[in-house]
């Protein structure tokens, strides 16, 4: 690996330990940029989350954690990477003193900012605002590698990040795999590849991550060696009594003292470091890996020496500098699963339980309890349990950063929007004859058309009831107005398809404004009506633009996205005969021969009820000749710019930045 941004540093104390197999210590030349990132993270934490009171993170007396562990971090990325690492240290300290449920709640809070399929737990927290600010900064520098980082970070938050800290381990061998994951292996993979602008080829990824584990284990156990005293103190003060640390595990397994456990731990560190040095040397000699993969693995070498040198004298693990870190109120994580309710056996008289009328001549006069809602809610419960992008819910919580709607009313508004949205999906799938919903059978393919329609209608009644519970007559009026708009919009969508009428682009946009935009309009209007703040800001334009962006993005992805094909079928909109923006553009702009061919294909779809794979490919070829897909993508770019401008206006109106909302829009950009 070429060295452009680092220098070798000799530390006698490091050499005396004999832990790093002679791996030289290299430190990035831009330590000032690292410290600037640390200071900025502290400032933002105090602004968005709370007071730090003497917190110590990545800063050491001579150099910082990032400078020593990623010595070849690009200078223009150092401050951002340092901010990200400090944010991770801050979060880590919160989880150290937390109960198991608190740890899960804290992790789910951050996971919610990374993974749209995770349920949004509350309004965008201060930590989510910091996280969104960081990711927006990273996206502006390098979108491709930031997306890798987001996925890696989400995987880490989902499966590790302290979730096993309360588990007991009977041996070091049992503890080791968990320590490898918990030391931030996945998060660090994303951060290193971003810091150095590395792209690991897909075919090498599994090998690279497997080989790197010895480096992470050496670094993780070194951290255990130096952090044990602090973590023991945290456990005592918090009352958890459980220390997630190799020293504690070794002491219990071998019934030895702290110093003896430390010696055993040092032996394991040397073992992992030596194995890693040999592996990297072999890889260099074979010269079979890509340049970027080898650079990532070589960085692991300097991560071993760098983390050891940093641990030696960093204030973070000195008990004399330790301060308690407060955790927020307990928030229990919610497990998600696909739910298909067990079907009860029905008997001839329509009752669920097998009852007998023998000896009961006056049964018709009995006063009986109301029937259960289990049957009518079964299709809705199924649709609700399917994987969801969850974008509307996240948009609500991001907007609530400004509006500060009380949580009880937010839950009701969420209930209104979710019931209307999912009931609309159930009816849409029937009206469009769609067999799939997010890779799973559509509700009517399981429960039948009549039962699904009845369930969807029932959910609209429950949505009305939730709107009524908001206790504001304005909310009921908003509910009625927007539900009317939504159904009017759907009527035109169905009318055009049934009668094979090509709408103008203006009419198509008006339909979107009523249908897709109507749901965004409903949620923003309900939130404004329930806000304790005096709100003069207008969300109508933002709702309209976001609705158009969502629908047109869906039009585009339906035709080009492999993920959409997996979830809904290849070019499903063409099977349904729906008029999308790309199709309308093609019909308006194609040469006569292509236009006639498109119309003939639409007729064939109506006759057969679908298009063949080959027919769909032909439609796509015509669209490509007409540049309809390029046109659609350009319109998405226009909408994204206008949405950010609308956010700018709202930021000026409220006087507060909204990083969560900006990040939400940025992550939906079509690549």
Curated annotation (Swiss-Prot):
Organism this protein belongs to: Talaromyces verruculosus (Penicillium verruculosum)
PANTHER family cross-referenced by the UniProt entry: GERANYLGERANYL PYROPHOSPHATE SYNTHASE, THIJ_PFPI FAMILY PROTEIN (AFU_ORTHOLOGUE AFUA_3G01210)-RELATED
Residues that, per the record, bind dimethylallyl diphosphate: 437, 515-516, 551, 558, 568, 578
Cofactor: Mg(2+)
Motif range (DDXXD 2): 428-432
Keywords in alphabetical order: Isoprene biosynthesis, Lyase, Magnesium, Metal-binding, Multifunctional enzyme, Repeat, Transferase
Organism ancestry: Eukaryota, Fungi, Dikarya, Ascomycota, Pezizomycotina
Renumbered ranges of motif NSE/DTE: 223-231
Gene Ontology biological-process annotations: alcohol biosynthetic process; isoprenoid biosynthetic process; mycotoxin biosynthetic process
Family the UniProt entry places it in: In the N-terminal section; belongs to the terpene synthase family. In the C-terminal section; belongs to the FPP/GGPP synthase family.
Positions with a binding annotation for Mg(2+) 3: 428, 432
Molecular-function annotations in GO: lyase activity; metal ion binding; prenyltransferase activity
Residue numbers binding Mg(2+) 4: 428, 432
Regions crossing the membrane: none
Residues at which Mg(2+) 1 binds: 92
Binding sites annotated in the UniProt record for isopentenyl diphosphate: 389, 392, 421, 438
Stretch forming the signal peptide: none
Domain of life: Eukaryota
Chain location of the short sequence motif DDXXD 1 per the record: 92-96
The protein, known as: Talaropentaene synthase
Swiss-Prot/TrEMBL domain comment: The conserved DDXXD motifs as well as the NSE/DTE motif are important for the catalytic activity, presumably through binding to Mg(2+).
InterPro entries given in the database record: Isoprenoid_synthase_dom_sf (IPR008949), Polyprenyl_synt (IPR000092), Polyprenyl_synt_CS (IPR033749)
Cell cycle is among the record's keywords: no
Listed EC numbers: 4.2.3.220, 2.5.1.158
Record's function text: Bifunctional terpene synthase that converts dimethylallyl diphosphate (DMAPP) and isopentenyl diphosphate (IPP) into talaropentaene as a single product. The C-terminal prenyltransferase (PT) domain of MpMS catalyzes formation of hexaprenyl diphosphate (HexPP), whereas the N-terminal terpene cyclase (TC) domain catalyzes the cyclization of HexPP to talaropentaene.
């Amino acid at each position: 690996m070429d060295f452009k941004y680092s220098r070798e540093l000799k530390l006698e104390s490091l050499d005396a330990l004999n832990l790093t197999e002679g791996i030289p210590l290299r430190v990035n030349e831009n330590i000032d940029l690292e410290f600037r990132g640390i200071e900025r993270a502290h400032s933002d934490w105090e602004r968005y989350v709370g007071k730090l009171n003497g917190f110590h993170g990545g800063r050491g007396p001579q150099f910082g954690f990032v400078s020593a562990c990623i010595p070849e971090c690009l200078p223009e990325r150092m401050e951002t990477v340092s901010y990200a690492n400090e944010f991770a240290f801050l979060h880590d300290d919160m989880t150290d003193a937390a109960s198991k449920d608190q740890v899960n709640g804290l992790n789910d809070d951050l996971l919610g900012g990374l993974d749209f399929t995770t349920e949004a737990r509350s309004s965008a927290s201060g930590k989510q605002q910091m996280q969104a600010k960081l990711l927006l900064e990273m996206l502006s520098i390098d979108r491709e590698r930031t997306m890798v980082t987001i996925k890696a970070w989400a995987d880490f938050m989902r499966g590790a990040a302290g979730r096993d800290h309360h588990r007991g381990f009977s041996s070091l061998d049992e503890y080791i795999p968990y320590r490898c994951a918990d030391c931030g292996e996945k998060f660090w993979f994303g951060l290193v590849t971003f810091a150095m602008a590395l792209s690991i080829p897909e075919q090498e990824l599994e090998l690279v991550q497997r080989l790197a584990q010895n480096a992470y284990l050496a670094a993780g156990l070194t951290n255990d060696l130096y952090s044990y005293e602090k973590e023991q103190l945290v456990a005592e003060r918090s009352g958890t009594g459980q220390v997630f640390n190799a020293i504690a595990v070794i002491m219990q397994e071998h019934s030895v003292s702290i110093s003896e456990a430390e010696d055993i731990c040092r032996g394991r560190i040397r073992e992992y470091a030596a194995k890693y040095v040999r592996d990297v040397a072999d890889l260099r000699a074979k010269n079979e890996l890509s340049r970027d993969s080898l650079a990532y693995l070589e960085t692991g070498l300097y991560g071993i020496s760098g983390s050891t040198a940093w641990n030696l004298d960093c204030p973070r693990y000195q008990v004399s500098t330790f301060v308690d870190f407060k955790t927020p109120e307990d928030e229990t994580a919610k497990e998600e699963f696909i739910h298909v309710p067990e079907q009860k056996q029905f008997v001839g008289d329509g009752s669920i339980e097998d009852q007998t009328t023998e000896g009961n001549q006056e049964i018709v006069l009995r006063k009986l309890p109301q029937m259960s809602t289990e049957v009518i809610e079964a299709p809705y419960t199924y649709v609700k349990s399917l994987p969801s992008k969850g974008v509307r819910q996240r948009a609500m919580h991001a907007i609530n950063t400004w509006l500060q709607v009380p949580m009880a009313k937010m839950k009701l508004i969420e209930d209104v929007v979710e019931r209307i949205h999912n009931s609309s999906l159930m009816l849409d799938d029937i009206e469009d004859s769609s067999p799939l919903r997010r890779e799973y059978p559509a509700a009517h393919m399981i429960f039948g058309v009549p039962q699904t329609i009845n369930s969807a209608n029932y959910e609209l009644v429950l949505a009305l009831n939730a709107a009524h519970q908001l206790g504001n007559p304005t909310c009921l009026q908003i509910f009625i107005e927007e539900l009317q708009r939504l159904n009017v919009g759907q009527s035109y969508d169905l009318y055009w398809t049934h009668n094979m009428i090509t709408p103008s682009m203006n009419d198509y946009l008006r339909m979107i404004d009523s249908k897709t935009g109507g749901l965004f309009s409903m949620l923003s209007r309900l939130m404004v009506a329930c806000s304790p703040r005096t709100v003069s800001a207008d969300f109508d334009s933002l709702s309209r633009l976001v609705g158009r962006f969502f629908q047109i993005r869906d039009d585009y992805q339906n035709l080009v996205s492999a993920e959409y094909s997996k979830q809904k079928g290849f070019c499903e909109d063409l099977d349904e005969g729906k008029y999308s923006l790309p199709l309308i553009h093609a019909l308006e702009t194609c040469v006569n021969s292509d236009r006639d061919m498109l119309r003939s294909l639409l007729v064939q779809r109506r006759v057969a009820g679908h298009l063949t794979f080959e027919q769909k490919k032909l439609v796509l070829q015509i669209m490509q000749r007409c540049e309809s897909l390029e046109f659609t993508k350009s319109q998405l770019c226009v909408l994204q710019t206008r949405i950010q401008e609308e956010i700018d206006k709202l930021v000026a109106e409220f006087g507060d930045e909204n990083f969560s909302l900006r990040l939400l829009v940025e992550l939906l950009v079509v690549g």
